[in-house]
């Protein structure tokens, strides 16, 4: 039986443009949870190898990786928003995102907040002078002409995006600066990967009870339990032996990180559902876009930095 849109009662593949085509393209050579598993594993191992080598031999290169990820992920979301009719000031958003992460190097959290604040202010002004129908050529600005329409919608989406990607990712960069910074980054990334792998595996094998079916039909309570078990085990070990924290801090951190990973995934799923798309991009075979792999990492980075900084 086809899923229906809760607001209209019409079949979901008819009520949300692009879903039917995306579903048809994604079902070929994919398992139950919708991934091309061999490609996903190959890409995941490649990314993991780069991260491990970076953190072991040159930890500060992590900031470069964060900056690159911010640019690519922000561009993916901007493109999708524009396809849906939003008028997003991409130039100041992408440049401001770089300032947000790079200012963490000399100024730490103050730099991240200053970069984010400046990005928001410039984007709000930029949107005022953009042509509503100029989605590809932002240099065509005008201080006169027809009144700006949908300003609140577009400005709100821009501020949301500036917080969601550059600001949240800057906390991932902040993790690497202390003496045990590499261990802290390992703690974050291993926790996220363990939560994702545990949830995916258990969900595919045993998932029967949907977690939030109206947002993400493939997620199940059984998968969440798998995330909790795997994420908790991995985080306690990494927080204790790599970040130098007590086991109770690792246990508390693990529980919160599993929640933020799951909620981050659900937030991106809802955004994609609003936009009528399956993936943010096609950069990573078996995964979708880069943003589709960062959905759980971004909010988890904020939590990881906060708890690893404040707790003994």
From Swiss-Prot:
GO cellular component: plasma membrane
Lineage of the organism: Bacteria, Bacillati, Actinomycetota, Actinomycetes, Mycobacteriales
GO biological process, one term: CDP-diacylglycerol biosynthetic process
Name of the molecule in the record: Phosphatidate cytidylyltransferase
Gene: cdsA
Enzyme Commission identifier(s): 2.7.7.41
Pathway: Phospholipid metabolism; CDP-diacylglycerol biosynthesis; CDP-diacylglycerol from sn-glycerol 3-phosphate: step 3/3
Catalytic activity field: a 1,2-diacyl-sn-glycero-3-phosphate + CTP + H(+) = a CDP-1,2-diacyl-sn-glycerol + diphosphate
Family according to the record: Belongs to the CDS family.
Subcellular localization(s) per the UniProt record: Cell membrane
Keyword list, A-Z: Cell membrane, Lipid biosynthesis, Lipid metabolism, Membrane, Nucleotidyltransferase, Phospholipid biosynthesis, Phospholipid metabolism, Transferase, Transmembrane, Transmembrane helix
Principal localisation: membrane
Taxonomic source organism: Mycobacterium leprae (strain TN)
Principal EC category: transferase
Membrane topology listed for this record: Multi-pass membrane protein
Residue numbers spanned by region Disordered: 1-31
Alphabetical list of InterPro entries matching this protein: PC_trans
């Amino acid at each position: 039986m086809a899923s229906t849109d809760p607001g209209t009662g019409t079949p979901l593949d008819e009520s949300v443009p692009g879903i039917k085509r995306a579903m048809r393209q994604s079902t070929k050579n994919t398992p139950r949870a919708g991934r091309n598993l061999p490609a996903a594993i190959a890409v995941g191992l490649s990314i993991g190898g780069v991260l491990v080598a970076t953190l072991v031999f040159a930890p500060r290169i992590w900031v470069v990786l964060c900056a690159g990820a911010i640019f690519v992920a922000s561009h993916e979301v901007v493109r999708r928003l524009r396809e849906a009719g939003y008028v997003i000031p991409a130039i100041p958003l992408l440049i401001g995102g770089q300032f947000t992460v790079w200012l963490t190097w000399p100024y730490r959290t103050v730099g991240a907040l200053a970069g984010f604040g400046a990005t928001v202010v410039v984007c709000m002004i930029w949107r005022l002078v953009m042509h509503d129908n100029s989605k590809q050529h932002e240099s065509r600005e005008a201080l006169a002409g027809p009144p700006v329409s949908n300003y609140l919608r577009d400005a709100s989406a821009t501020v949301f995006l500036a917080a969601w990607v550059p600001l949240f990712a800057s906390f991932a960069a902040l993790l690497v600066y202390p003496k045990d910074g590499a261990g802290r980054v390992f703690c974050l990334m291993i926790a996220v990967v363990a939560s994702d792998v545990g949830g995916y595996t258990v969900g595919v094998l045993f998932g029967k009870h949907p977690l939030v079916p109206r947002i993400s039909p493939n997620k199940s309570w059984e998968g969440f339990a798998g995330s909790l078990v795997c994420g908790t085990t991995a985080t306690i070990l990494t927080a204790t032996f790599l970040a130098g924290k007590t086991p109770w801090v690792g246990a508390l951190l693990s529980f919160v990180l599993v929640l933020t990973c799951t909620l981050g995934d659900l937030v991106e799923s809802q955004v994609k559902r609003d936009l009528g798309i399956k993936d943010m991009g096609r950069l990573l075979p078996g995964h979708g876009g880069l943003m589709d792999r960062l959905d759980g990492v971004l909010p988890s980075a904020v939590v990881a930095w906060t708890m690893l900084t404040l707790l003994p």
